[in-house]
Every structure is written in structure tokens, then in C-alpha cells.
Amino acid sequence: MLCATKLKRVAQAARRLLFLVGVFFWAGCDYHVDSIYLGRKEAKFLGHVSQGDLKAVTLYLDRGGDINLQDEPGMTPLHHAVNADVRGSRLEMVKLLLQRGANVHAVDDTFYTPLHLASHMETAQVLLDAGADVNARTRRNGETLLFSAAWEAAQGRGKNYETYLNLTKMLIARGADVNLKLRSGSMIEEDAPYRDKPGDAPLHGVARSYSEVEASEVCSILIQAGARINEQNVRGHTPLDEALANERPQTADFLRSQGAMTGKEWKEQSPGNPEENRPVIQSSLNPAESE
């Protein structure tokens, strides 16, 4: 999930940039004054949401403010609260917004729901308890939160490892589909072995990770949850193919121990219909996408 996750980080950084611009607005800049979406009060309100100012947000809502307003990228206050959440730092803000009627199913211009932006297990749990779809998919490539959470966990980056590993386990426990496939792959260097490919399942992305100890653990979790170990993407590559192509011998050995085969090996052992395990890319959109 290298490309998809990097794109997500870029998108999150861009969204946070809106609030840096907001600082200039509060200092007297007329940012958003001419916006067809937001007025001065609304822009300031989103700033309070991002900063976790419960008192200011409550005051705005008590005065009749729109809890589901959307800014230019289509983000709602709930999107902003989750996007600003660092290890639960905006959990109380998320709870407040949900209690006041925030739409947990709202999508921005890329069809990210608030859940897609979650990086903290408890925050994601609160969203799911409020009715968020654990398998909600983005517009471009059909990514779910499980894709990015599992990939992040497989990178083994200090505290983030435990954070995303716990998030991955929780999502699976809450019904995340471990076999959903990407509709499209990377927009750049699409032929590079480390890039996402159409038809990838979460296991493909995890198998590419350079942190092989952590990747093997995440692979084990996905497999135990029902991930099809020999699932193929549109190029006929299984997760084992991806591990080998990216020179991940430890991950490859682990996958072999679980019965993994390469796409070529699978084809040779499936004389009846070698195409039967080729992926069917789910093309169904989120309900809001068809409106």
C-alpha cells in the first residue's frame, strides 16, 4: 500500500495546510471571505474543531451553526476532527460532534469518510459505534481503512507499529473485509514492484514491506482472518510474487510456510480453469457515489 498510503498522507497534509492558512485568517486575512462555501464564522469554527476547542465549538453549535458544513475539499467538521487526531488527542471532539448530529457517512471530494482518516483505534471505534461503514471505499482506487492500517502496521515504525497493529486487529474484529481489492493501482511508476496494482488485496501490500518481521506478523493476522493467500491481482501476482519481486525473503518464507504459491505455480496446479482465481475487481461505489 506504498502509493495509496503516501497519497493519503499528502492529502492529509494538504488538509492541515488549510488551517495554517486559517491562522492568517484569524490575524486579519480575508481567506474564505469570498468563498462560496464558507463565511468567516464557519472558517473559524473549523479551526476550533481542528484545535480541539470544545467550548468554542459548543458555543458555535448552540447558536445554530451547521455541524455538517463542508469546505472546498468537501470535508465536514467531523473529517477535520479525525484528521487532526493524534493518538486520541481529538477523541472528545469527535464524540462531541457525533453527539450533536455530525454525519458519520459524509464523504469529501475524494469520497473519504471520516473513518478513512482515522489513525487511532479508539477514535475509529467511536466512529464505527456511530454507524460508520468499516468497508467504505475511496473513489479512485477503492481503498478501505484496513488497507492503509495494515500497510502502516507492516512498516514497523516505533510507536506507530502498535498503534496501527491494534487498529488493524480492531477493524477485522468489526467486520473489515480482508479480501477487498483495489480498483486501480499507483498513478506513478505503475510498473515498479513496490507500487500498488489493480486487484491488490491488503495482503499484497503488506507482503511488499521492507520491515519483514512486522510484515510477517501482519500477514499472519490477515491470513487468520480469512485472507486468501494465493489471491491474484490483475497481473496474476499473488502476495508471494510481491514479496519475491521486492526481495523480501523472510516474508516469502513465512508465506510459503502458510501454503503460498506464486501465480505461475498456481496456474500450473489449476489445470481445469487457471483463470478462476483471477480477481474480480469490485466496482460498486459507496452509496453516496451513485447520487
PLM region spans:
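Bacterial N-terminal signal peptides that target proteins for export
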Residues: C3-L18
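Bacterial N-terminal signal peptides
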Residues: R16-W26
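Bacterial signal peptide processing site
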Residues: D30-Y31
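Start-of-repeat signature of ankyrin repeats
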Residues: K41, G74, F111, N141-G142, ...
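Ankyrin repeat A-helix N-terminal signature
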Residues: G47-G52, H80-R90, L117-E122, S148-Y164, ...
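Ankyrin repeat domain, specifically the short helix-to-loop turn at the C-terminus of the second helix
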Residues: T58-D66, K95-N103, Q125-D133, K169-D177, ...
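Ankyrin repeat boundary/linker residues
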Residues: D71, D108, T138-R139, L182-S184, ...
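Leucine-rich solenoid repeat scaffolds
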Residues: E231-N277
